[in-house]
């Protein structure tokens, strides 16, 4: 019989996941129950995708600001260093910054402009043009930024992130100086000790700093890579991919994800006789044309997946074939 339905995506409702839960069993059982209730047949190469958030929650993979601060003090014992290129996000960075500030005496906060790495804008390009500001070469103090652009709030959240981050640091009893620049090496005029908070460009940023005379350089994926006073950790990504859980706690990106996907796949294979692919996913990596935000604040789109999902797409563009 001719196939009339293409790829179908279904959301499977599962129980609330808590720390200590067997995530592999819960996922497999939820999928099997849903398939039975809805009369969904299983086929080889079906894909079960699990959000990273529930995997991390089941692992109890959390860290609080005191634990982050302790790790920061071990990395920057002088207490004076720069925090450069953080993304502008209360969910993604505010609690991390709070922990960083609690472990510091003075922070030089250097923000990229007109936007952060994932497209959250402090200001728009037209404003730069009208003021004659060159983002490729000009380094702005907070005073210069205010004199040029005044108070600018995020279009969706209504937050002035320059003020928000500055106040968050100072409220922790830490001295702060704000700079806006896009060349990471600009920070070396202020300090030789740097915490790189960019995500996808962090390797290059660290290399440029070390080649240019920086003394101590760490990236976010090097913070909280092992347990601190009983905290969670991520040995591969550190604080990258973390999300705000409470005012003083972050949920870290999940770890040991290969074991999780293999366990889920094995349980589904045993129950169905089919080779079902499994992946853990994070941000979708789309770009919003209105807010100009590129939705990829996680270090990777998928921290783990089964072998059948390996490789690059190999597809035919049907509309091109139809026209030719």
Question: Model regions: which residues?
Answer:
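Conserved mixed alpha/beta catalytic, RNA-binding, or beta-rich assembly cores of soluble enzyme
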Residues: 2-44, 53-324
